[in-house]
A protein has these predicted regions:
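Mobile gating loops/cap/lid regions near enzyme active sites that modulate substrate access
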Residues: 1-16, 30-77
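Charge-dense, extended regions
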Residues: 118-122
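Residue-identity detector for glutamine
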Residues: 3-5, 20, 104, 123
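Histidine-centered active-site loop/cap adjacent to the catalytic His
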Residues: 64-117
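Sec/Tat-exported extracytoplasmic proteins
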Residues: 22, 33-37, 51, 90, ...
Length: 123
């Protein structure tokens, strides 16, 4: 017995449909960028790599909740480190496509999850 009603969760078939649509959407983006000769940042690939865990300049980054450094406490939005890594994906795509020399962001200058202050207020 599942405590959550079916209308609130995806079953296997629905999950497969979502994955298929994501892949179709990403292919459409890739085709649109190619048709206009534009740089393409592989955000989907980046997020999949983070999901599996990566090491950047000795810093471990993953999608692991709280300790993974990539996602904030809401589990959806990127942390400053996650945003710095994402910026580097865009910078790499631009540099590669256009021969630019935009420097990469130094990820070590950014923080991961900022824990809320749980200390009692003092007077």
């Amino acid at each position: 017995m599942n405590p959550v009603e079916d209308k609130y969760v995806l079953d296997v078939s629905e999950t497969e449909t979502v994955v298929q649509r994501i892949n179709e959407y990403n292919e459409a983006i890739k085709a649109a960028a190619a048709s206009k000769n534009l740089a393409l940042a592989d955000v989907h690939g980046f997020l999949n790599n983070v999901k599996d865990g990566v090491r950047i300049n000795g810093l471990a980054v993953s999608a692991k909740y709280i300790t993974g450094n990539a996602f904030s406490l809401d589990g959806i939005h990127l942390t400053p480190i996650g945003n710095a890594l994402m910026a580097n994906i865009f910078i790499s795509a631009i540099n590669s496509k256009y021969g630019s020399k935009i420097p990469q962001v130094d990820v070590a200058k950014y923080r991961g999850v900022k824990m809320p202050d749980t200390a009692p207020a003092t007077k």
